[in-house]
Amino acid sequence: RYGRKPSEWQYPPTNDNLQQQAFALFDRLMIEAVDTECQVSEIAYLNPKRPLAKNKVARCIDMSQLSTSGAFPSGWEMKPFTGGMRFTNGDTLLARITPCLENGKTAYIDFLDDEEIAFGSTEYIVLAPKEDIPPEYLYCLARYPAFVDYAVKNMNGSSGRQRVSADTIGQFVMPCPSETAIKDFGKVASALFMKMKNNSLENLKLSSLRDTILPKLMAGEIDVSNIQF
């Protein structure tokens, strides 16, 4: 099984089921393409340049907001951009530092506005799809057990601050399915990820509403005496 047990808040069972369907499709592609190989750098741009002016207020997604099991982060903040990795819709974020990499800190970005650039930790590796590669394909790869194992085993640095480099990630050798197979995967995966995004956005709205109303209920600021159960 990919990743870890989904958190009750941000990754409900429905989303976990949808994600596992995508992973099953990806697994089948890897099994059926055992006779052909390619490197990640052939299908993905690693840390592509994204334009974002210094001090421009933009959406910031912190490492603490990345899920260890799902594609959607737990939230974000609007901050002036002073540095960090930049990304846009269709990108996959992969934590490159211990213990975040081992814990599965990963995200798929599909909830920004059109042409919006967001930013986050310098400890992210950003994977962006090359031509004809469905963006969901790279997210599934980032959670593929063989890929994660490779990334963890190729970390370097002092104890407690080990990292894997983008160049090393780009050298990962994987099965290379046919263009038709990848295209078919994309058609199904895009629908699954769309459902996951909509579920997560709705869950985020409900959580925000709960956090707003609950303190007022506890403080007696909302009259519930006329509510019938």
Model regions and ranges:
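Non-catalytic DNA-recognition/assembly elements of restriction-modification systems
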Residues: 1-53, 69, 179-225
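A short beta-sheet element
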Residues: 89-147, 155-169
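A residue-level signal for beta-strand positions that form part of recognition/binding surfaces
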Residues: 37, 58, 124
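Sequence-specific dsDNA recognition surfaces
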Residues: 41-95, 100-109, 120
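Conserved functional hotspots at enzyme active or ligand-binding sites that engage polyanionic ligands
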Residues: 152
